[in-house]
Regions:
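N-terminal catalytic cores of peptidoglycan-degrading enzymes
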Residues: 1-83
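Cell-envelope and extracellular/periplasmic
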Residues: 33, 82-97, 114, 118, ...
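Structural preference for beta-strand elements that scaffold enzyme active sites
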Residues: 26, 86-88, 142-144
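Extracytoplasmic/periplasmic, Sec-exported soluble proteins
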Residues: 19-21, 48, 77, 81, ...
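Extracellular LysM carbohydrate-binding repeats and other cell-envelope/extracellular binding modules
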Residues: 194, 203-243
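Basic/polar, cationic surfaces and motifs that engage anionic cell-wall
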Residues: 2-11, 16-21, 95-191, 229, ...
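Structured segments of extracytoplasmic/periplasmic soluble domains
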Residues: 35, 44-47, 70, 112-123, ...
Length: 243
């Protein structure tokens, strides 16, 4: 079992179990709640009194640190079961909701997750907004979040709402076959559109010959700018796709 060649800094934490008892098949992304460096994160995980660690961390500058080797289980997600099968990644973030990460850190995260998947034979990354799917690895889901196992905001709404986008981009890099579009026309005539990377509500509305305001109202979307990749959006039956 190898470690990532993308690592810029290593400081192994004593807070771990060696070896892990499950093969690596899951990715768990966390927010640090602080725009810190990989060195600072290493200092945080160094004391045994901390009782916490992660496999990897990404600093505000996009550098990548390793604190627990991949062969070992980190103490990161409030779940031994999850951490035994997951690679855990802490990402430098703002200290307040929605705990945003900057572009350098996000770009490094995409590189990191892609590398982990390639080396561990994860052929496709699958995200679900359904907690049951995530916790039980149903329907191919292999991405989990800290809030699944504890009363925490982690990974923050910024990263949580981008998990579908992360999966889509990593799968593109992996060359994973695209899922069949989940667009269909039920008996009611209502169309279900699955949001794809790069789409906005305005673009979707234009495709169906309607307005984004109408779609937002129909789906009770309070903020038209907050839609995510993989989200299912209902298109009113009295609209039709532009020719």
């Amino acid at each position: 079992m190898s470690n990532s060649p993308l690592v810029n800094y290593t400081r192994i934490s004593p807070n771990k179990n060696s070896p892990r008892n499950h093969k690596i098949d899951t990715i768990t992304i966390h927010c640090v709640v602080g725009q810190c460096s990989v060195e600072t994160l290493g200092n945080i995980f160094a004391p045994t009194s901390r009782q916490a660690s992660s496999n990897y961390g990404i600093g505000f500058d996009g550098k990548i640190g390793m604190y627990v080797e991949e062969k070992d289980r980190s103490w990161c997600s409030s779940s031994a079961s999850n951490d035994n099968r997951a690679i855990t990644i802490e990402v430098a973030s703002d200290t307040k909701h929605p705990y945003a990460v900057n572009e350098k850190a996000f770009a490094a995260l995409l590189d990191m997750v892609t590398d982990i998947c390639k080396r561990n034979g994860i052929k496709r990354l699958v995200w679900s907004t359904n907690k049951k799917d995530r916790m039980n690895h149903l329907n191919g889901c292999n991405m989990t979040v800290h809030r699944d196992y504890a009363n925490k905001a982690c990974p923050g709404d910024y990263l949580y709402n981008r998990h579908g986008e992360i999966a889509a981009e990593v799968n593109r890099r992996l060359g994973a076959s695209a899922e069949k579009p989940a667009e269909n026309k039920p008996a009611t005539g209502e169309v279900i559109h699955t949001v794809k990377a790069g789409e906005t509500l305005s673009k979707i509305a234009q495709k169906y010959g309607t307005t984004y305001q109408k779609i937002a109202a129909y789906n009770r979307i309070a903020n038209a700018n907050l839609i995510r990749v993989g989200q299912k959006i209902k298109i009113p039956a009295d609209t039709q796709a532009a020719q």
